[in-house]
């Protein structure tokens, strides 16, 4: 069955990365993937979590939130603390960002990534990972210059959703596809093709190894295109 937006199974949605969207942050990126829009900022802060103190090493962590009207109906703000889904997503973003570093030898500083969804049409967590990597790259340059340490940023990290809809493996699901997918997965990749994380769920039963392999092939091809866009945004 054709996709609603006319894309082929292996096509990404239109992708745009606006580096430096927030001039106050040490690093920032406004990422648009189709109808999904996420603002990612990276802030360098003095100090580290308590368990990290005295080690001389830094840390990278992430927070994620959705604006109330990022979705078709208003969602209340999480004023009582992050819910389970939010915790899961921000931990994913943090793990992915740390995979971009060569290590944490940049003194007791924390780089905090804030990923705020302005508009959601599927793939918000994967868009956040890809945008956060651009913001992190710039923040690491700023930190290295101010702290007199080697730039800890080593490689780009990108993420994309894949799934099976109407029996067909597809790349970069929009919300309309995501909500009816037989299989829904998110894949995080460190450049060029190192798997950082694979999250996959059979929503209505099981799926075959061959289908998983096809989804991974789609994800690796998709993240290769995202890496190219990240490099272009960073001027590399």
Model-inferred region functions:
Residues 16-18, 30-32, 39-41, 61, ...:
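Structured core elements
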Residues 78-82, 115-124:
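A short glycine/serine-rich beta->alpha loop
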Residues 13, 96-100, 180-184:
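Short amphipathic beta-strand starts and helix->beta connectors
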Residues 40, 93, 97, 128-140:
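Buried hydrophobic packing segments
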Residues 83-88, 122-130:
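Short, conserved micro-motifs enriched in small and acidic residues
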Residues 105-108, 123-127, 137-141, 147-236:
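A structural signal for small-residue-enriched, beta-sheet-centric alpha/beta enzyme cores
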Residues 1-32:
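Short, Gly/Pro- and small/polar-rich lid/capping loops
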Residues 21, 28-106, 195-217:
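Glycine-rich, flexible beta-strand/loop modules in the N-terminal catalytic cores of phosphate-handling
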């Amino acid at each position: 069955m054709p996709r609603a937006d006319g894309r082929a199974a292996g096509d990404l949605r239109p992708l745009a990365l606006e580096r430096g969207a927030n001039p106050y942050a040490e690093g920032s990126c406004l990422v648009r993937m189709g109808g999904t829009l996420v603002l990612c900022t990276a802030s360098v802060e003095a100090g580290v979590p308590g368990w990290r103190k005295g080690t001389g090493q830094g840390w990278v962590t992430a927070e994620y939130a959705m604006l109330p009207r990022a979705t078709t109906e208003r969602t209340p703000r999480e004023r009582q603390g992050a819910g389970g889904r939010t915790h899961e997503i921000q931990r994913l973003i943090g793990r992915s960002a740390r995979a971009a570093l060569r290590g944490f030898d940049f003194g007791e500083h924390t780089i905090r990534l804030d990923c705020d969804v302005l508009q959601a049409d599927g793939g918000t967590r994967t868009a956040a990972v890809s945008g956060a990597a651009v913001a992190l790259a710039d923040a690491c340059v700023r930190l290295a210059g101010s702290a007199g340490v080697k730039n800890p940023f080593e490689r780009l990290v990108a993420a994309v959703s894949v799934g099976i809809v109407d029996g067909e493996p597809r790349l970069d699901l929009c919300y309309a596809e995501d909500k009816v997918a037989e299989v829904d997965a998110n894949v995080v990749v460190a450049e060029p093709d190192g798997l950082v994380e694979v999250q996959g769920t059979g929503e209505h039963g099981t799926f075959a190894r061959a289908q998983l392999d096809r989804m991974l092939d789609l994800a690796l091809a998709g993240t290769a295109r995202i890496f190219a866009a990240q490099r272009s945004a960073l001027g590399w």
